[in-house]
Design a protein with these regions (language model features):
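Tandem repeat domain/solenoid detector
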Residues: 98-100, 116, 120-125, 131-140, ...
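Leucine-rich solenoid repeat scaffolds
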Residues: 284-335
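Surface-exposed cap/linker segments adjacent to membranes
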Residues: 2-65, 315
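The feature encodes a structural signal of leucine-rich repeats
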Residues: 89-91, 111-116, 135-140, 159-164, ...
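LRR flanking "cap" motifs
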Residues: 43-91, 253-260, 328-335
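Leucine-rich repeat
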Residues: 64-65, 69-150, ...
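Consensus "Asn ladder" position of solenoid repeat domains
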Residues: 83, 107-108, 132, 153-156, ...
């Protein structure tokens, strides 16, 4: 190859590489409106270090803590886990109209209320704001997020009553409001949750009153009402043909005849009724619950012999003690 041709080829290669950066700049996938919204969120969080990859000169689809849709290249996920954020949730989060998933989890310095701007997120399916320091009332407008499937506000400082509108989303499958400071009664509207195989967590609050009978119309897979101040008869939650796997009702003031209870025999793996005012005896049908792994009826007013069979004798005496006159293995024999 002649020296002239070599120099020409080298010049061509250098010229080609020189224009590559300008080509890359014009090929950014991130939507400009989404990028501006994210940068406003970063500014509201005082340029938190956890968001340091959010650089205005780079493609936001390549940033950490967010995810772009593979086709539209719009931001569909905002996820910041385990610290790094302080202040309140910026209203600019509502300026990401294609968001489907929000996960702000274990942010002890995340405070304030849930902003009303989230109402604009009509595509939102998963909203997790757990293990933070959010406070104030739970906003009823969350029930207007029609595509919501999973709502988790657990481990915060929310107060006030449970909005009846939270059961409105037609595909809601999981509602977690546990570990807050909620008061008042359980709204009857929660008996209209329509999502398949629903989960309901209301434990560790200050809820009062009776469990609405209409909750028995919902085939909950998991229900936890423990550690409240609830009373009355929650036995509509039970049923031989229900699909419940875990039922936690401990440390309330429930009062019903356990002898008449029909446990979900094919699916139940956990039943905790300790520290209530439950009377009667343990039904023989409990011996047919073949997958039972957690069982506790201690600190109630039960009497009679513990039925023999199934898994009932695999639990130690602490699952049965401090009842009125319960007897039989693993307790003392009946006289």
């Amino acid at each position: 190859m002649s020296s002239f041709r070599f120099r020409f080829l080298l010049f061509s290669l250098l010229a080609s590489s020189a224009v590559l950066p300008s080509f890359s700049a014009t090929s950014e996938l991130c939507n400009a409106d989404d990028k501006r919204a994210l940068l406003r969120i970063k500014k509201a969080f005082n340029d938190a270090y956890v968001l340091s990859s959010w650089d205005a000169t780079t493609d936001c689809c390549e940033w950490n803590n967010v995810e772009c849709d593979g086709t539209t290249h719009r931001i569909v996920t905002l996820s910041v886990l385990r610290g790094g954020l302080s202040g309140s949730i910026p209203s600019a989060v509502g300026d990401l109209p294609y968001l489907q998933n929000i996960y702000l989890h274990k942010q002890p310095n995340l405070t304030g209320n849930i902003p009303r701007s989230l109402l604009k997120l009509k595509n939102l399916q998963y909203l997790t704001l757990s293990y933070n320091n959010l406070s104030g009332p739970i906003p009823g407008f969350l029930g207007d997020l029609v595509n919501l499937i999973f709502l988790d506000l657990s481990y915060n400082r929310f107060s006030g009553t449970i909005p009846s509108s939270l059961s409105n989303p037609p595909n809601l499958r999981s509602l977690r409001l546990d570990r807050n400071a909620l008061t008042g009664s359980i709204p009857t509207s929660l008996g209209h949750i329509q999502g398949s195989s629903p989960y309901l967590y209301l434990s560790h609050n200050q809820l009062t009153g009776e469990v609405p009978a209409v909750l028995g119309d919902v085939d909950f897979v998991y229900i936890d009402l423990s550690r409240n101040q609830l009373s009355g008869d929650p036995s509509t939650l039970f049923g031989r043909n229900k699909s419940a796997q875990q039922i936690y009702l401990s440390r309330n003031m429930f009062e019903f005849n356990m002898s008449e209870m029909e446990p979900p025999q094919a699916s139940l793996i956990a039943l905790d009724l300790n520290h209530n005012k439950i009377f009667g005896g343990i039904p023989a049908a409990m011996t047919g619950v073949t997958y039972l792994q957690i069982f506790n009826v201690s600190y109630n007013r039960l009497c009679g012999e513990i039925p023999v069979g199934g898994r009932l004798q695999t639990f130690d005496s602490t699952a049965y003690f401090h009842n009125r006159c319960l007897c039989g293995t693993p307790l003392d024999s009946c006289k």
